[in-house]
């Protein structure tokens, strides 16, 4: 049923004006949705919890290998040009980096929970790093 704009009217002391009712015939003529089914949506948080369980079970690397390798080479360019890396060296750097990030996010989550929140914020990361002694 279409909404109509309501305007203030001066009362004449009679009955209040009623909303117009749409007849059954008018409803049938109205364009239907065509029976289009809405896509299924999980409740908020369900998919997040499923992803948490999935990634806690797994041991594979979460950062793609080639973008990480490009990042390592880009950072190394600042120190010395024409550096070459063994594949195992890049893999060791990636393992260490991901282990560090996972531990940092765990501590960050604890800081957010301590503040009675479930959403992590930059200030939680800063607090976690400060408690660890990484950043004065």
From Swiss-Prot:
Modification type N6-(2-hydroxyisobutyryl)lysine: residues: 5, 10, 15, 19, 24, 28, 37, 57, 65, 80, 123
Source taxon at top rank: Eukaryota
Region described as Disordered: 1-42
Coiled-coil zones: none
A GO term for molecular function: protein heterodimerization activity
N-terminal signal peptide: none
Sequence positions bearing Allysine: 5
Main location: nucleus
SUPFAM superfamilies, per database record: Histone-fold
UniProt modified residues of type Phosphothreonine: 4, 7, 12, 81
GO cellular component, one term: nucleus
Residue positions, PTM 5-glutamyl serotonin: 6
Chain positions with N6-butyryllysine modification: 19, 24
Residues recorded as bearing N6,N6,N6-trimethyllysine in the entry: 5
Residue numbers of N6-methyllysine PTMs: 5
Modified residues (N6-glutaryllysine): 15, 19, 24, 28, 57, 80, 116, 123
Gene3D superfamilies according to UniProt: Histone, subunit A (1.10.20.10)
A Pfam short name: Histone
Function: Core component of nucleosome. Nucleosomes wrap and compact DNA into chromatin, limiting DNA accessibility to the cellular machineries which require DNA as a template. Histones thereby play a central role in transcription regulation, DNA repair, DNA replication and chromosomal stability. DNA accessibility is regulated via a complex set of post-translational modifications of histones, also called histone code, and nucleosome remodeling.
Protein name, per record: Histone H3.3C
UniProt organism field: Xenopus laevis
Gene name of this polypeptide: h3-5
């Amino acid at each position: 049923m279409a909404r109509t704009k309501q305007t203030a009217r001066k009362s004449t002391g009679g009955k209040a004006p009623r909303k117009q009712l749409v007849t059954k015939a008018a409803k049938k003529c109205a364009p239907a949705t065509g029976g289009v089914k809405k896509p299924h949506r999980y409740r908020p948080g369900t998919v997040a919890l499923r992803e948490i369980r999935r990634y806690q079970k797994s041991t594979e690397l979460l950062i793609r290998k080639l973008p990480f390798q490009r990042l390592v080479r880009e950072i190394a360019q600042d120190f010395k040009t024409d550096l070459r890396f063994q594949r195992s060296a890049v893999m060791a750097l990636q393992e260490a980096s991901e282990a560090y990030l996972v531990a940092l996010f765990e501590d960050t989550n604890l800081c957010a929970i301590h503040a009675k929140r479930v959403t992590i914020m930059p200030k939680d990361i800063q607090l976690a790093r400060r408690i660890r002694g990484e950043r004065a």
